[in-house]
């Protein structure tokens, strides 16, 4: 059964998938990273969710973090296209569809985390 994008159910399923995916687990082995994503214009209004990695574990949930390393903002359309694999994050950033703030050097240092996240969830059934 598909999880609805950007809901608690979706966040829980993504978190579970990430923590059981060997490639993702390898990418976060030494990553202490906090990212907050702000998505505007969703069917439920604006939604914030976060990814926190520390100690070889990942936590993804709805809401925000105190003092995230990086903040990412996008429209629902862009977030859904990235989630569906129709748009990669680098292209979205380069075309201005993703607004990124905070410690960009740290984000680039841990680019494998983002790449492995996409790889881990590529077959997840999601309802948009």
Predicted segments with their positions:
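Feature captures hydrophobic
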Residues: 1-128
């Amino acid at each position: 059964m598909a999880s609805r994008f950007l809901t608690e159910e979706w966040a829980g399923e993504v978190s579970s998938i990430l923590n059981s995916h060997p490639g993702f687990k390898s990418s976060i082995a030494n990553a202490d990273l906090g990212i907050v994503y702000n998505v505007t214009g969703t069917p439920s209004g604006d939604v914030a969710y976060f990814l926190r990695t520390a100690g070889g574990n990942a936590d993804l949930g709805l809401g925000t973090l105190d003092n995230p390393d990086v903040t990412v903002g996008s429209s629902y359309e862009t977030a859904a296209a990235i989630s569906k694999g129709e748009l990669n994050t680098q292209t979205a950033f380069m075309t201005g569809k993703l607004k990124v703030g905070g410690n960009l050097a740290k984000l680039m240092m841990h680019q494998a985390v983002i790449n492995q996240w996409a790889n881990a969830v590529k077959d997840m059934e999601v309802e948009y």
